[in-house]
Swiss-Prot record:
Taxonomic placement: Bacteria, Bacillati, Bacillota, Clostridia, Eubacteriales
GO terms (BP aspect): translation
Pfam family, one: Ribosomal_L28
Domain of life: Bacteria
Keyword Ribonucleoprotein: yes
Organism: Desulfitobacterium hafniense (strain Y51)
InterPro entries tied to this protein: Bacterial_rp_bL28, Ribosomal_bL28, Ribosomal_bL28/bL31-like_sf, Ribosomal_bL28_bact-type, Ribosomal_bL28_sf
Protein family membership: Belongs to the bacterial ribosomal protein bL28 family.
Record keywords, A-Z: Ribonucleoprotein, Ribosomal protein
Protein's recorded name: Large ribosomal subunit protein bL28
Gene: rpmB
Record's GO cellular component terms: ribonucleoprotein complex; ribosome
GO MF annotation list: structural constituent of ribosome
């Protein structure tokens, strides 16, 4: 799936952006995903992972 972290499942969030003149428009917030080579079930695969999972060490990177 696009725009979803393979580890924690973080995806796109939607909401309303409010300008200084209080004009409200719909917008989306996308997670900061990186395509990395990681070890999944003993085999190296390429997955999309958010940077929070990368920084916290939840991903075992393939060498």
């Amino acid at each position: 799936m696009a725009n979803v972290c393979a580890i924690c499942g973080k995806g796109v969030a939607s909401g309303i952006q409010v300008s200084h003149s209080h004009i409200r428009t719909k917008r989306t917030w996308k997670p900061n995903l990186q395509r990395v080579h990681a070890i999944v079930n003993g085999t190296p695969t390429r997955i999309s992972v958010c940077t929070r999972c990368l920084r916290s060490g939840k991903v075992q990177r393939a060498v």
